[in-house]
């Protein structure tokens, strides 16, 4: 998550989907498999699976693919043996990097991550070295172009639903919640006729750091390569883009 608005980041990622649809399908299918493996095949009783299915539908993954991924995860067959863990490290200028990984080959992934970081002025760190710089939050995005309510009404509805804060951006409202309250706040907003453009848990940096010149170029390239890696599900940093 960069210093730009979360909605801007989401739209930037969605713009890449058409050119990298195969990678997007792979990552979202993997998330569905893991969610079904850990919590069962019924999305009504498995919030992680429900969220993964919603992401897959937004990315236009065919329903047949979604169902196959659910069956693969719930059945525990081949392809369901992904290991989940996090890597922590640093980018140029001491930027904090937190990576959520799901892989069937830890050694391969470690080598690839280490190579990407070291080639662009960063390095892997020990467990816990940067995690403390982030807070886990639920983030709900409301696209301003999709609602006719005033800022005050949106903020009041969100806070009454249990949100912690509402950030007003040029093109969106970014509503933050405790992770465990994400689904209930989202449901309450939808029930009031407020369309939700995106909702997910994320790691929010407590403070952000700006880079300039060569360091900024290296950091941008590093993030691009990390996000493109099939084994890396999520990339979080405290880097604030100019």
UniProtKB/Swiss-Prot annotation:
Example of a GO cellular component annotation carried by this entry: cytosol
Molecular function GO terms recorded: DNA binding
Predominant localisation class: cytoplasm
Record's signal peptide: none
Compartment list: Cytoplasm
InterPro entries per record: Integrase-like_N (IPR017856), TACO1_YebC-like_2nd/3rd_dom (IPR048300), TACO1_YebC_N (IPR049083), Transcrip_reg_TACO1-like (IPR002876), Transcrip_reg_TACO1-like_dom3 (IPR026564), YebC-like (IPR029072)
Keyword rRNA-binding set for record: no
Protein name per Swiss-Prot or TrEMBL: Probable transcriptional regulatory protein Dred_1658
């Amino acid at each position: 998550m960069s210093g730009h608005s979360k909605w801007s980041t989401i739209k930037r990622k969605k713009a890449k989907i058409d050119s990298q649809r195969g990678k997007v399908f792979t990552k979202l299918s993997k998330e569905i498999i893991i969610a079904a493996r850990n919590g069962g095949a019924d999305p009504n009783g498995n919030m992680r699976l429900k969220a993964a299915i919603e992401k897959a539908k937004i990315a236009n993954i065919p329903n047949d693919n979604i169902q196959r991924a659910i069956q693969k995860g719930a059945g525990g067959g081949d392809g369901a043996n992904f290991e989940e863990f996090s890597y922590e490290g640093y980018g140029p200028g001491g930027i904090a990097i937190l990576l959520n990984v799901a892989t069937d080959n830890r050694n391969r992934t470690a080598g690839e991550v280490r190579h990407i970081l070291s080639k662009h002025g960063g390095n892997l760190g020990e467990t816990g070295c940067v995690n403390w710089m982030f807070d886990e939050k639920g983030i709900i995005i409301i696209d301003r172009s999709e609602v006719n309510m005033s800022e005050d009404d949106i903020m009041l509805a969100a806070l009454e639903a249990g949100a912690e804060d509402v950030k007003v951006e040029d093109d969106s409202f970014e509503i933050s919640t405790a992770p465990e309250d994400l689904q209930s706040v989202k449901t309450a907003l939808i029930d009031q006729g407020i369309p939700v453009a995106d909702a997910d848990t994320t790691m929010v940096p407590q403070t952000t750091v700006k880079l300039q010149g060569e360091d900024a170029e290296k950091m941008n390239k590093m993030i691009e390569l990390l996000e493109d890696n099939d084994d890396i599900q999520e990339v979080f940093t405290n880097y604030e883009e100019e």
